[in-house]
Amino acid sequence: QSPGFPVTLLNIKTDDIWIRDYGPFFVKQGKRTIVSETQFNAWGAKFPPWKNDNQIPARIMKATGYGKGTSVPFIFEGGAIEVNGDGLGITTLDCLVGKNRNKPEDMSKIIKAICEMLGLKSLLILPHGLNGDHTDGHIDNVARFIAKDKVVIAWDKGMKSKNAQVLSEAKYLIETWLKAFYAKNAVVETLPLPPQRKLSDGQILPASYMNFIFVNGGLIYPKYKCKNDAVAQKFFEKAFPDRIVIGIDSRTVIEEGGSLHCMSKHESR
């Protein structure tokens, strides 16, 4: 416990920084918090080792004293799911089944297990995520809930962009799905992507403003030193007038394939 700050530091060994994906799911059962988990294998066995990462939920549960929740027996990462707190969730197909992930024939079991773990009544499965995302297309780079009936989605109008069609289809699917639950109150807004950079080896960096995080009284979003940073700042300030909005230069961290949301794990109140 840090003096003067409500922060407890846990010294736990990991294999990678992206705790969003291998960390615990903090689930509320009334006033009680439990720790649930899915299985993790470093995004389809792309980046070994992952032994330490896969043990993080159990170690955090022991350190916090929280109760034991569900252990889902399927490969699935925290960055692959976005929920609204009202029984709705969004994910992408490529993160559910695929090479070194889960078998297509287990799809119905996977959906049921995720919905039961998170208390979801509906899980929307988008076909794809951003081009170049080596997580197989996490939703936290594509679209996020900013209210129970409102979603913001990354946007690209470039005629030659591989993301343009993916995001246009995703927007249509989200709008149709959201209206089924919230009718005319359902809203899907767009926020332009920053320019998509490439490394010297040709690897595309899936930079996105969707990788923002909520903190107590604030919102922190990734910046990429481009003109769309100002657009993102204005959008978040308008969407969350009661929060302090801060942008952090994330050009270095995106070179490792993730950003702020990926390297953090929140515990809901």
Which residues does each PLM region occupy?
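The feature marks the mature, well-folded catalytic cores of soluble enzymes
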Residues: Q1-R269
